[in-house]
Structure formats: structure tokens, C-alpha cells
């Protein structure tokens, strides 16, 4: 996911309404034609549209003004000016629009195709025809167009994932994501390979049920203070239903690592600690996927939560992991799938 941008300040302005026309009817042999100035066109609106295929805000330049088209001025012969074209700004699903002055949330996009008109174009001004009365037969004035709405905004993207994979660098998060979703994150044998979130879709039960999984960049101790890559990427799992804590089975310090990870999550947002979770120990192929060793680990650390041992690279025990994800996080949804088939 190159060029991943999840926050950008922008300016937006709806179109100015066109001015009304001051014009009089002109016709051969008619000395005093009456007013026939048309109205100005309405300014274009600024509309945000959620696009399911977008994954980043990289198309937006910081502090740039994004303006809809102004309405055109009115014309003679009672012809109204053309309305300005609306400006459609596409954003990823999960984008929040925030007022940069008050920092209030204006809108939160949760569905593909969802739209929101953030600023309405100004009304066009009335032409002098509108002002003709029995007393004032030839008004020589018209109305200016109104200004369109304008805002200073912050666009903030929070990916809409159902499950978040959290762990230390090099725990195998990207490999696990690739194996269970067929996503294509960058994978290598060194820390901080993942520099931005990756998202994939798991297809279950003959594709009758799907859910999204986010692979979050590695977290290290002190991340909440900006160490390593920091924890700003945790915004992308604020809305998940569950968390997979992933550990390196070749260098296992489960209790200490879990305590550190949960501490960093809590420092970012305490509500993350209330989410359901599974403890997943990866790279068990180092131990030849030994059942007795797996049993020993599960017994030793059972007080911490449910433990599942896998090898993402060798695809060992992945189906069981997916079954447990179904059961722990999506029981009701899976039940509905079978009730409706």
C-alpha cells in the first residue's frame, strides 16, 4: 500500500451563485423594451462520496483549496445562467470529516457509495425582470449571487476492519494476513517491514460470510511515546470486533509481550482493552509443530486467554484458527448465515 496517507487537512468551498442580469428587451421599432434580465445560476455543491476501492487519502494535497464551480451570470431575454457543476470528492470508506476549527466530527463514512453534501452552492441572484413592478417599470438593478459554503477540514481515515492483527515487529503478521486473505503485503525477515496497515478479506462458509482483517505495523515498548513507528496506526483497529495478538514462537516471552502490547494499546485508547481477543503463537514449525510442546504452552499460559498455535508460513493449523475466529467473534453472524440458507 504505497503512498498510504490517513490524515490530511484541506479547504473546501462551494460555488458562488451567479449574478442576476440587468438587461432590457431590444426589438426593432420598440423604443422602450421592458426588463428581461435572467437570474444567475446556482453555485455547485461540494459532495463527499465513499469509494470502497480506495484505501488511502493520498490523492489529497495538504491545505489545498477544493472548490466547486461558480454559477454563471444571468443573460438577457430572461435566460438564466448555468448552474455550477458540483465537486465530487471521493474518499475511502472509514473516512471521517472533522471541522479543523472546532475539531468536531462532521461526518463518518461507513458504507461504499455513501455520500454527504458538506457545502451547498450559493443561490443565483435575481435578474432585473424579478424587480419589475407597476411602479418600477424599468429597474436598473439586479441581485448579486450568494456565496457558497466554505470549511477548513481534516480528513481522517480509520480503516473499517473486523479483526486487527497486533504484535511485535517480525511476529509474522503480514504472512498470516496473506495466507488467510490472499492479500499481498510486503513480507521480509526483518522488523518494520510493514510501514502502513494492510487490509484483506477472509471468505468463509462457501463465501456466504466474509470479514476484513487489518495487519497493523509492529508495536514496540514505548510506541505510545513515539518510539519505533509510534501507535498512530492503531486508529485503524478502533472499530474492530476482535484482536489477534500474534507472537513469535521462536522467541516466546508471551506474558511479558502481551502485557507490553496491552499497555501500549491502553495508552492509545482504553476501549481497545475491552475488545475480545485470541492469543496466536506463530512459527511453530520451528518446533516441528510438536503437539506436546503446544500442549505445554497452552497449559502454562492458559490464565492469559485462549491460545492457538500455528505456522502461517507452513499453513499449519490455520483452518482451526479461522474456526475459532468464527466462534469467538462472529457466532451470531455465522448462525444467521446457516439459518438463511
Swiss-Prot record:
InterPro entries, A to Z: G_OBG (IPR031167), GTP-bd (IPR006073), GTP-bd_Obg/CgtA (IPR014100), GTP1-OBG_CS (IPR006074), GTP1_OBG_dom (IPR006169), GTP1_OBG_dom_sf (IPR036726), OBG_GTPase (IPR045086), P-loop_NTPase (IPR027417)
Enzyme kind, highest EC tier: hydrolase
Principal cellular location given in the protein's record: cytoplasm
Requisite cofactors: Mg(2+)
Residues annotated to bind Mg(2+): 174, 194
Residues engaged in binding GTP: 167-174, 192-196, 215-218, 282-285, 311-313
Matching CDD domains: Obg
Cellular compartments per GO CC: cytoplasm
SUPFAM superfamilies per the UniProt record, alphabetical: Obg GTP-binding protein N-terminal domain (SSF82051), P-loop containing nucleoside triphosphate hydrolases (SSF52540)
Keywords assigned by UniProt, alphabetized: Cytoplasm, GTP-binding, Hydrolase, Magnesium, Metal-binding, Nucleotide-binding
Protein name (record): GTPase Obg
Amino acid at each position: 500500500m504505497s503512498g498510504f496517507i490517513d490524515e490530511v487537512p484541506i479547504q473546501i468551498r462551494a460555488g458562488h451563485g451567479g449574478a442576476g442580469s440587468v438587461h432590457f428587451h431590444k426589438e426593432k421599432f420598440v423604443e422602450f423594451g421592458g426588463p428581461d434580465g435572467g437570474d444567475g445560476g446556482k453555485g455547485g455543491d461540494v459532495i463527499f462520496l465513499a469509494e470502497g476501492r480506495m484505501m488511502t487519502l493520498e490523492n489529497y494535497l495538504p491545505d489545498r483549496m477544493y472548490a466547486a464551480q461558480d454559477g454563471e451570470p444571468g443573460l438577457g431575454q430572461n435566460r438564466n445562467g448555468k448552474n455550477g457543476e458540483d465537486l465530487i470528492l471521493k474518499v475511502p470508506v472509514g473516512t471521517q470529516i472533522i471541522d479543523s476549527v472546532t475539531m468536531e466530527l462532521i461526518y463518518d463514512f461507513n458504507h461504499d457509495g455513501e455520500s454527504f453534501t458538506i457545502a451547498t452552492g450559493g443561490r443565483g441572484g435575481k435578474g432585473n425582470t424579478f424587480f419589475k413592478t407597476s411602479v418600477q417599470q424599468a429597474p436598473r438593478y439586479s441581485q448579486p449571487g450568494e456565496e457558497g459554503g466554505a470549511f477548513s477540514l481534516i480528513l481522517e481515515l480509520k480503516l473499517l476492519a473486523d479483526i486487527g492483527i497486533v504484535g511485535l515487529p517480525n511476529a509474522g503478521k503480514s504472512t498470516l494476513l496473506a495466507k488467510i486473505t490472499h492479500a499481498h503485503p510486503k513480507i521480509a525477515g526483518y522488523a518494520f517491514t510493514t510501514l502502513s496497515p494492510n487490509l484483506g478479506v477472509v471468505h468463509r462458509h462457501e463465501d456466504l460470510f466474509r470479514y476484513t482483517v487489518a495487519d497493523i505495523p509492529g508495536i514496540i515498548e514505548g510506541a505510545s511515546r513515539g518510539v519505533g513507528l509510534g501507535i498512530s496506526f492503531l486508529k485503524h483497529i478502533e472499530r474492530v470486533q476482535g484482536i489477534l495478538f500474534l507472537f513469535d514462537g521462536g522467541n516466546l516471552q508471551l506474558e511479558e509481550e502481551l502485557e507490553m502490547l496491552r499497555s501500549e494499546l491502553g495508552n492509545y485508547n482504553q476501549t481497545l482493552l475491552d475488545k475480545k481477543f485470541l492469543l496466536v503463537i506463530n512459527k511453530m514449525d520451528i518446533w516441528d509443530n510438536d503437539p506436546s510442546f503446544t500442549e505445554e504452552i497452552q497449559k502454562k499460559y492458559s490464565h492469559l486467554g485462549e491460545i492457538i498455535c500455528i505456522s502461517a508460513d507452513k499453513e499449519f493449523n490455520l483452518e482451526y484458527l479461522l474456526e475459532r475466529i468464527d466462534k469467538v467473534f462472529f457466532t451470531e453472524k455465522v448462525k444467521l448465515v446457516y439459518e438463511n440458507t
